[in-house]
């Protein structure tokens, strides 16, 4: 019997109370009884001596009754099995506690487990014997069931931990492909750009994504020099001209030129070639043609296909240029355009030449000068026609109006115009394609709306001093007897009326074709009958090219001398060269499809929701413009990259939801077209390398993908860690210093796309293996979350135990219920005869001994 019980048989101490409560619990159990019919408070883990004394005081009446019951109890045949089962459950509980503490890493419990929640001395056993329990005695208790699960779970946890560590160590040095990085670089000279125009006033350009013109942002990024939009000026001009005239109808042949090209021996031996040049005639409407030709339409050029414009002056990135007034034909008055007068320095034939050297007159020191000159024109009715009755308002009643006969060949739309300044023009200059006789000038004229006439614009040509001899070329100057030249006065004096006419056609060379555009019908539809006037509408920023004229000392033959000391060049403005000059400030850049960076980028990449494909808008505009311009290092850019993704994702979702609610069809049209266009553009980027990136393990929503080690080792894609410097380098510097690395990855993509035999075979094997074990690659991510959760819960429980003593009793009860804590029940026996038998019961049945023999 315990020492405390022997000292005072009336007062029941903690040790005797513990055994009495064990007996009380054991009597409630059967062979297949519940695992935990009750909890012995004296066996709660961590109970103190003071708490045991308090329990004794509270439970003293109950304990006295249990002691009396034990003295009267009869040891029945079934009691031995109950005691053996209680003892088995006690040790099974200790096993479960060991597994749980092993699971949470509390290994010191394994060393001190016999001191926790048990008597200071265990049940006395004279000689340790091997205990054996039948399966009926063990049964399938909750402890056994959960113990097996806990053991399997613990083993699986550590197995996954080892696998995860192995995978992490195996991929720690992997290299990562950063898809669509926040970076812009110059395009190559050989790259093809796709562009279109946007002009709100012109239907020919309204089919483009007009809203893209507003997608721009300032940046302090410095981009390496590369091709500008001016490199494609000729192609852009040709396309714009076709857009301006695309609604023109082709009619009959306007002119046919027959020429003979002789061979090196003349026409001997049939070496002559007869060439016939056919100039077709196109009928056009003035409102769709003339405004474009004179640069009256504000046109923005926008890039597609992932290309972006970088304004070298304003440091802005945008999809479109600022609105430009682009004249499509040669003009005397035009925007500021640099021209060269020294022919020895002219390499590009499209650059306008500012002087001539085949005359004695030598034009040099050409300069562009702005001007405020105005041309005023008025028309007086003088053509044959008929009086027609016109219906007027009720006040004026009906009246008769004069309508000229436009179908008559004698009908000619003539005007009288004057200039506000004296204009002296240079020697010879061509007008369109085909010589214009006499002194001449062309300009645009605007007519305001009135009661009898609508608002309109016309192209007017004024000619004076037209020579009678068509074989001679009218040349500005006063020198007589010049071979092949007819001297004319090319000065247009201020406030002097000159005979002018509406220009009803013009000839242009587009690409390799010469075309004549007939606008006779367009002129008729603008109601030119009657008396009206117009004023030139030259933009205030336009001017002309003024050159100094000096006479050379050459006197070999009679040549035309300078009429004045200065001369204005007619049709000096070259539309292609002018367009090139306007577009030189726009550098064409692109966002790389991918950037190879070290694997450590994945360490400081925040966990965020994957973005949808239309969030490429943020990558191509907001991020590339604002983010890349901060000059931040690669480490900071990764975080900012995902912040922009998340922010823009939320913005797009909110805008789309608002549009659905309000059902603003007209307002949302441009937005929908913009989003569709950007989706297509982003999909093109993904589809271009879709197969290759998929084989590398990247899906369409992933922006960081690891390159398989066998690939970057095979292609020797070694990253210079010194240059990377743990991410303390800007992405622009990294791209410039690792171009060879990016090129090698491009070779990998191309090899995969071209179904390289070796790569294809390896990828097939990799695909078969990945179908089975592909989920292993995500284990480290899962383990991080699982391990972090377990550690967090463990630390939280530990803090509660240490910092909240008032909740200790509640926590004990909860732990006992969760762990299924069970105690043993051993009754006290007073007779010596029964002592031996009880020792057998306490020790359990020996192997090979029946219950009756044991009793």
From Swiss-Prot:
Q: Which residues lie on this side of the membrane: Extracellular?
A: 1-784
Q: Which GO terms describe its biological process?
A: symbiont entry into host cell; virion attachment to host cell
Q: Site annotated as Cleavage: where?
A: 610-611
Keywords per UniProt: Cleavage on pair of basic residues, Coiled coil, Disulfide bond, Glycoprotein, Host cell membrane, Host membrane, Host-virus interaction, Membrane, Transmembrane, Transmembrane helix, Viral attachment to host cell, Viral envelope protein, Virion, Virus entry into host cell
Cell cycle found in the keyword field: no
Which residue ranges are recorded for the region named Fusion peptide? 615-635
Glycosylated residues?
220, 258, 269, 274, 298, 336, 418, 422, 448, 469, 481, 499, 518, 531, 548, 551, 716, 720, 728, 736
Q: Which of the residues are on side Cytoplasmic?
A: 806-855
Spell out where the chain crosses the membrane. Answer: 785-805
Q: Where is this region: Immunosuppression?
A: 661-679
PTM note: Specific enzymatic cleavages in vivo yield mature proteins. Envelope glycoproteins are synthesized as an inactive precursor that is N-glycosylated and processed likely by host cell furin or by a furin-like protease in the Golgi to yield the mature SU and TM proteins. The cleavage site between SU and TM requires the minimal sequence [KR]-X-[KR]-R.
| Matching InterPro entries | Envelope_glycop_lentivirus, GP41-like
Highest taxon listed in the record's lineage = Viruses
Any one GO CC term of this protein is: host cell plasma membrane
Q: Which GO terms describe its molecular function?
A: structural molecule activity
In this entry, which stretches build a coiled coil? Answer: 642-692, 735-771
Q: What does this protein do?
A: The surface protein (SU) attaches the virus to the host cell by binding to its receptor. This interaction triggers the refolding of the transmembrane protein (TM) and is thought to activate its fusogenic potential by unmasking its fusion peptide. Fusion occurs at the host cell plasma membrane. The transmembrane protein (TM) acts as a class I viral fusion protein. Under the current model, the protein has at least 3 conformational states: pre-fusion native state, pre-hairpin intermediate state, and post-fusion hairpin state. During viral and target cell membrane fusion, the coiled coil regions (heptad repeats) assume a trimer-of-hairpins structure, positioning the fusion peptide in close proximity to the C-terminal region of the ectodomain. The formation of this structure appears to drive apposition and subsequent fusion of viral and target cell membranes.
How is the quaternary structure described? Answer: The mature envelope protein (Env) consists of a trimer of SU-TM heterodimers attached by noncovalent interactions or by a labile interchain disulfide bond.
Which protein is depicted?
A: Envelope glycoprotein gp150
